[in-house]
Amino acid sequence: MILGITGGVGAGKSSVLAILEKEYNAKLILADEVGRELMQPGEANYVNIVNAFGKEILNEDQTIDTKKLAATAFSNPLETLRLNAITHPNVRVRIEWMIKEIRDKEPDALIVIEAALLSEGHLIPLCDDVWYIYTDEQTRIKRIMESRGYSQERCLQTIARQKSDAQFRAECRVVIDNSHSIEETKAQIERHMKKYR
C-alpha cells in the first residue's frame, strides 16, 4: 500500500510520519529530501536549475545555495512555477524508482510519500490513499515560530503562499486533525489504518 501525506507548513506532518514509521513500520519517502538530493552537482536537476536561475545561486564549492534559490524562485509565482517545472518530473521518476526498490525487498511494505505538493508533483496517481494533515492556523503559527524562529508576520506570509485548507481537502480522502494531543492524532491514524488491513 502507498499512502500520500500532505499538508501545510507547521501542520505536524513529521509527527504523523514518526507514528506511521514506529507503529506501522512504514517506509518513508520525503519528496523535499529527494528534491534536495537531485539539486546536488551531477544530479538530474542541478544543471537546469543553475541555467534557469543563474550562477548567483551557487556557493563557492559550486553547490546550490538553497536560501538564495528560494529567495529568487519564490519571489513571484512565475519563478516558482519555473522551478517546479524543472524539479517535479525528476523527483517523481526518483520516487517511482525508490518505490520499486522498497517493493523488491518488501512487497507488502507500507510506503508513505510525504509532499506538500503531492498533486503538483503528479504523485497522487502513485498513491492508494491520500491524507491531509490539518492543524488550525494559530497552532501552525506557534509551531513555525518555535521550530524556525520566524516572526508572526513571516509565518502568516509563509502560510499565505501555500495552498488553502479547502484546496488540500479537495485533493485528499482522509483528514487527520493534528491540532490537539499526540494521543488524539494516534487514535485517528489507528482508526484509518484499520480500514486497510
What are the roles of these predicted feature ranges?
Residues 36-109:
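ATP-dependent small-molecule kinase phosphotransfer cores
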Residues 96-105, 111-146:
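ATP-dependent NMP and nucleoside kinases share a basic, alpha-helical "lid"
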Residues 11:
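ATP-binding Walker
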Residues 95, 124-125, 146, 150-197:
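Small-molecule kinase domains that catalyze NTP-dependent phosphoryl transfer to phosphate-bearing small molecules
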Residues 14:
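Walker A/P-loop
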Residues 5:
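Hydrophobic anchor at the beta1->P-loop junction of P-loop NTPases
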Residues 26-39:
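Short beta-strand-centered segment that lines the nucleotide-binding/catalytic pocket of NTP-utilizing
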